[in-house]
């Protein structure tokens, strides 16, 4: 017998939609208003900078001839499927894990869309200190990192007792 979807972690899928709208919206604005390589200072140590990433995090495998596009697309799809199954198997009340999974799925789908549509991921956030620049990233990357951090945080939190779970 199947359980009602709103009693599962899938209740948190609305957050995937929010992440996608914000991520794809920010990338659309960059594509419409910036030429490749353009930079606009926002705050000290923070720029908007249009960059294309043909690889993964930190441009890993960016110069590998194109096969990596499909490799990373497959990884994103696989991770999304696994996390959706985990959300279905978890209770809607397990907020921290489900929020984390939804953030990761939203970020993965945002970057997957870029890979499939453009052949690269649109990056635009340039954080720097002095002459040192962190790798340029986007809001999907941020959602994935926040989701991963929440999973780690959940591992350090005390587990609820049987009474608290009932």
UniProtKB/Swiss-Prot annotation:
InterPro entries named in the record: Peptidase_A8
Location within or outside the cell: Cell inner membrane
Stretches that traverse the bilayer: 12-32, 70-90, 102-122, 137-157
EC number of the protein: 3.4.23.36
GO MF term set: aspartic-type endopeptidase activity; endopeptidase activity
Reactions mediated catalytically: Release of signal peptides from bacterial membrane prolipoproteins. Hydrolyzes -Xaa-Yaa-Zaa-|-(S,diacylglyceryl)Cys-, in which Xaa is hydrophobic (preferably Leu), and Yaa (Ala or Ser) and Zaa (Gly or Ala) have small, neutral side chains
Membrane topology: Multi-pass membrane protein
Active-site positions on this chain: 123, 141
Role summary: This protein specifically catalyzes the removal of signal peptides from prolipoproteins.
Protein name: Lipoprotein signal peptidase
């Amino acid at each position: 017998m199947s359980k009602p979807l709103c009693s599962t972690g899938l209740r948190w899928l609305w957050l995937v939609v929010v992440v996608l709208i914000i991520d794809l919206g920010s990338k659309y604005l960059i594509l419409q208003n910036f030429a490749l390589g353009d930079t606009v200072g926002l705050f000290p140590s923070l720029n908007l900078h249009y960059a294309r990433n043909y690889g993964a995090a930190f441009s890993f495998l960016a110069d590998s001839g194109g096969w990596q596009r499909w490799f990373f697309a497959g990884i994103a799809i696989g991770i999304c499927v696994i996390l959706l199954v985990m959300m279905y198997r978890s209770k809607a009340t397990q907020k921290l894990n489900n929020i984390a999974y939804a953030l990761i799925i939203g970020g993965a789908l945002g970057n997957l869309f870029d890979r499939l549509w453009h052949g690269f991921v649109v990056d635009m956030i340039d954080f720097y200190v002095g002459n040192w620049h962190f790798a340029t990233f986007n809001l999907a990357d941020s959602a994935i990192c926040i989701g991963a951090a929440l999973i780690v945080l959940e591992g350090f939190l005390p587990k609820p007792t049987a009474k608290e779970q009932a």
